[in-house]
Amino acid sequence: MLIDPPPPSPEEQAAIERAWRDAKLAATDGDVTRHRDELEEGTATTLTAEQYTALQVYRRQLRDWPENGEFPLIDHRPAAPTWLIE
Protein backbone atom coordinates (compact mmCIF):
# COMPACT_ATOMS: atom_id res chain seq x y z
CA MET A 1 0.00 0.00 0.00
CA LEU A 2 1.37 3.40 -1.00
CA ILE A 3 0.94 6.33 1.31
CA ASP A 4 1.10 9.94 0.19
CA PRO A 5 3.95 11.84 1.80
CA PRO A 6 2.91 14.41 4.38
CA PRO A 7 2.55 17.97 3.13
CA PRO A 8 5.49 20.28 3.79
CA SER A 9 5.58 21.98 7.16
CA PRO A 10 4.85 25.72 7.23
CA GLU A 11 8.59 26.38 7.50
CA GLU A 12 9.34 24.12 4.53
CA GLN A 13 6.57 25.74 2.47
CA ALA A 14 7.93 29.21 3.29
CA ALA A 15 11.42 28.11 2.22
CA ILE A 16 10.03 26.69 -1.04
CA GLU A 17 8.19 29.93 -1.80
CA ARG A 18 11.20 32.09 -0.92
CA ALA A 19 13.29 30.02 -3.32
CA TRP A 20 10.63 30.49 -6.02
CA ARG A 21 10.57 34.24 -5.33
CA ASP A 22 14.37 34.50 -5.39
CA ALA A 23 14.47 32.64 -8.72
CA LYS A 24 11.94 35.06 -10.24
CA LEU A 25 13.95 38.05 -9.05
CA ALA A 26 17.17 36.56 -10.42
CA ALA A 27 15.48 35.77 -13.73
CA THR A 28 14.55 39.44 -14.21
CA ASP A 29 17.87 40.94 -13.05
CA GLY A 30 19.19 40.84 -16.61
CA ASP A 31 16.17 42.74 -17.96
CA VAL A 32 16.68 45.51 -15.41
CA THR A 33 20.42 45.70 -16.05
CA ARG A 34 19.98 45.75 -19.83
CA HIS A 35 17.36 48.53 -19.61
CA ARG A 36 19.58 50.66 -17.37
CA ASP A 37 22.59 50.09 -19.62
CA GLU A 38 20.60 51.08 -22.70
CA LEU A 39 19.43 54.27 -20.99
CA GLU A 40 22.98 55.16 -19.95
CA GLU A 41 24.24 54.51 -23.48
CA GLY A 42 21.50 56.69 -24.93
CA THR A 43 20.34 53.90 -27.23
CA ALA A 44 16.83 52.64 -27.87
CA THR A 45 15.60 50.47 -25.02
CA THR A 46 14.36 46.94 -25.44
CA LEU A 47 11.60 47.58 -22.89
CA THR A 48 9.15 50.44 -23.14
CA ALA A 49 8.91 52.80 -20.18
CA GLU A 50 5.58 51.17 -19.29
CA GLN A 51 7.08 47.67 -19.42
CA TYR A 52 10.01 48.71 -17.26
CA THR A 53 7.66 50.26 -14.69
CA ALA A 54 5.51 47.11 -14.68
CA LEU A 55 8.64 45.00 -14.23
CA GLN A 56 9.78 47.07 -11.27
CA VAL A 57 6.29 46.88 -9.71
CA TYR A 58 6.38 43.09 -10.10
CA ARG A 59 9.84 42.89 -8.54
CA ARG A 60 8.67 45.05 -5.60
CA GLN A 61 5.68 42.73 -5.11
CA LEU A 62 8.03 39.75 -5.09
CA ARG A 63 10.27 41.37 -2.47
CA ASP A 64 7.30 42.39 -0.30
CA TRP A 65 5.41 39.09 -0.60
CA PRO A 66 6.98 37.35 2.44
CA GLU A 67 5.68 40.20 4.62
CA ASN A 68 2.17 39.72 3.24
CA GLY A 69 -0.38 37.84 5.35
CA GLU A 70 -1.05 35.52 2.39
CA PHE A 71 2.54 34.24 2.24
CA PRO A 72 3.43 31.40 1.52
CA LEU A 73 0.16 30.44 -0.21
CA ILE A 74 0.90 29.54 -3.84
CA ASP A 75 -2.43 30.99 -4.99
CA HIS A 76 -1.25 34.41 -3.82
CA ARG A 77 2.09 34.53 -5.62
CA PRO A 78 2.68 37.87 -7.33
CA ALA A 79 1.70 37.66 -10.99
CA ALA A 80 4.27 38.57 -13.62
CA PRO A 81 3.31 41.05 -16.34
CA THR A 82 1.77 39.13 -19.25
CA TRP A 83 4.42 40.34 -21.71
CA LEU A 84 7.13 38.87 -19.47
CA ILE A 85 5.52 35.42 -19.53
CA GLU A 86 5.20 35.33 -23.32
Residue ranges, per PLM feature:
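A preference for well-ordered globular domain cores
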Residues: M1-E86
